[in-house]
Amino acid sequence: MNSTGSKAIIVGFLLLFGVFGRSVAQEPLLFDLKRVADRPPPDVEKILGKPSKIVDDVFRSSRGSTYPATRAAYMNGAIEVVYLEGGARYLTIWVQKLSGRYQDYSYPKDGWKLLGDLGLDRNTTADLSNQAVTRWRDLPGIYEINVFPTSEKQIWYVHVLINRIYQ
């Protein structure tokens, strides 16, 4: 093969990767959930920015256990992180408070898309999906994610539980 043919192939690959790279870049992650999970507040602030509100509280699990907690609101209240025992263990993402494309996410169809926006595998099979909730369990580094709809079948909010001991 001559050098002109090689250059044409290389240029073709560069154009191909440039086009696909640009389409992926147009849909950035909301944030990488695995980089927030179990992390202390200073690490979370590097990803989500400074909190707009911080409240000392008590977290009550569904099993009746209580833990001293700090609740921090990020991104103008769209993301609430509950810090238990020093780490981000429980998150609530108010999808309808996020800007742009997130407000148009429909339930249940776009629940998988939202997983990808959180840096997780969009092809993960849900453990449960019905009119009230879509649930994924035992994702790498994350115990449970629950997506809840509005009455208009949009995604309303997401609960993320990092470790089952806080369930």
Predicted segments, located by residue:
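Short linear loop/turn motifs
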Residues: 57-64, 126-134
